[in-house]
């Protein structure tokens, strides 16, 4: 019935709020979400910046939806609507929307969610409805006198997708290994994201952004590397379109080969943009992957 759909829509967003909030408050969860916040620009592409490890924990938070008997097709539909809604709020070009800000997630209150300013952090977790944040005390309003600075307090300073997805996991492993306290070896994983053992903070300090002198990550790149990267981008777009168009007729092995080729190509192209010149060995690896995929076709 219509009431089932309405109930499911609200329940999904309620579960999303708590899933999202805890992914900002528990480090092992934050490790699977941080990729979405690494971006130091705020635009629609930020919405597409998604982690590869989110599947590890997120499903747990939606179990109540199935426990109360919501049909799978209803769950998938409301989840899709919720996800699509979140796309448009990743923009700086839409100002505050008056009464809308009191009920729904908007570009203004979502800009705060992505800001690393001390006044703004840990706020506005809703997916569609912002009243969850107002109800549970996590709402913060965008101030005219304080422009949001986007990104994470501990900057990634890289376009390497492997580093982005594994950076916090690596930090937790190192900190839990280095600290002398048995208690802290466990606490590292379940603490707040900014917490580190005192002995490790002293022996292995981590650089944090100076927001008074903040500059987004934008390494200088030679003209040749830019041309190379554009060529790789067009190749990636073409192969992605071809794979998508024929995915129903592909075997799992075929799809896996194409996916690995795209992953290697895009990663090497991104890493090349961080240097003035191409690296010989990665380019050999990329070319080999392309040749093998073409032979397989």
Question: What does each model-found stretch correspond to?
Answer:
Residues 21-30, 189-210:
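Short, charged cytosolic
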Residues 241-248:
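Juxtamembrane "helix-exit" motif on the non-cytosolic side of transmembrane helices
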Residues 250-261:
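Structural signature of hydrophobic alpha-helical transmembrane segments
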Residues 147-195:
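A membrane-cytosol interface segment of integral membrane proteins
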Residues 2-161:
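Membrane-embedded catalytic scaffold of the fatty acid hydroxylase/desaturase
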Residues 280-287:
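Cytoplasmic-side transmembrane-helix entry/capping segments in multi-pass membrane proteins
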Residues 295-297:
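Conserved small/polar residues in nucleotide/adenosyl-binding loops
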